[in-house]
């Protein structure tokens, strides 16, 4: 081949190689742009500080997938690929924060649960964040609300007061979960505003927490689950004081395998002379809980403290219902939910650790938390001490 031909071939090869390089660089740039665009659309939640105690991080990573699988099983949902978002905090409008950390749990790209790490027992409330023992809980708390705005490039602050939980975005405050109080109006928009101090702290302290997927080891972490065979959630408490009525109805429906019980009818039986208008304000006392259970053929007795994991396991196998009696740690006499009742649904072993499954009448799904925790961090930013149980429903 003469030199001119060699030169021509070399030039052609050079042109082809340069073209391929340009195309590959373009594809690389477009790919990076797509990733950046996708990343920019992630929901961001404002926090004062992104510093999370290492024990909280470790517990969340170790526990979230097993908890999610166990809760999926309770709702007969298919398991999937579980991932953990970043921790966020919830603030009062004056800037105070609560003592818990919240993680969005993501399954197949959708926020399905919220993992909550809160003080384990009453003594932990007085300890520092680093020294505190934490209880792990999973529920659907505000998960659907977060998922609805997950891909809308939103930047929010999660707030709370006695009426419920709110999302603040661009100066607008929106109620997403209302407290079950009598005469509480479910206002979608609120005139409340974030305090200037909190605004400044959120603005200057750190970058927001991103609700994004983090890879985690996926293992079969649920070793055992045992629940009341026929337990179903049929109703939800909102604008009344009937937590014990809801809990008794749910437990009796489960253990008798029926759907004849409901909270209203139980409260009407307990308060036959009270008007319908005043009935929502009526609460239930321990002697009424025992007497109503007996009237339905159940031998109810009160037991102090939290029942052991083994006791819950055996009672659940025997189709015997347990009602939780809890009291607000704050002891605020003006709190309409100073006392609260919940239904134990069963127990589980996740990562070789003992858990209890329960239903809070304020919620539409079950919750799971550590069996050795006497504190219940419930949906409306309240810590309750589990002081006793009614057994036998």
Curated annotation (Swiss-Prot):
Function statement: Cysteine protease that plays an important role in the inhibition of host innate immune response. Degrades host elastin, fibrogen, fibronectin and kininogen. Blocks phagocytosis of opsonised S.aureus by neutrophils and monocytes by inducing their death in a proteolytic activity-dependent manner. Decreases surface expression of the 'don't eat me' signal CD31 on neutrophils. Cleaves host galectin-3/LGALS3, thereby inhibiting the neutrophil-activating ability of the lectin.
Signal peptide: 1-36
Enzyme Commission number, as recorded: 3.4.22.-
Regulation: Prematurely activated/folded staphopain B is inhibited by staphostatin B (SspC), which is probably required to protect staphylococcal cytoplasmic proteins from degradation by SspB.
Gene Ontology CC: one annotated term: extracellular region
Active site: 243, 340, 360
Entry GO MF terms: cysteine-type peptidase activity
Positions of the pro-segment in this chain: 37-219
Family the entry assigns: Belongs to the peptidase C47 family.
Compartments, as annotated in UniProt: Secreted
InterPro entries: Cystatin_sf (IPR046350), Papain-like_cys_pep_sf (IPR038765), Pept_his_AS (IPR025660), Peptidase_C47 (IPR008750), Staphopain_pro (IPR028076), Staphopain_pro_sf (IPR037155)
Chief location bin: secreted
Subunit structure: In the cytoplasm, prematurely activated/folded SspB forms a stable non-covalent complex with SspC.
Enzyme class of the recorded protein, top EC level: hydrolase
Name under which the protein is recorded: Staphopain B
Keywords, comma-separated and alphabetical: Hydrolase, Protease, Secreted, Signal, Thiol protease, Virulence, Zymogen
Other noteworthy facts: The cascade of activation of extracellular proteases proceeds from the metalloprotease aureolysin (aur), through SspA to SspB.
Stored Pfam families: Peptidase_C47 (PF05543), Staphopain_pro (PF14731)
Positions marked as site (Cleavage): 219-220
Biological process according to GO: proteolysis
Record PTM text: Proteolytically cleaved by staphylococcal serine protease (SspA).
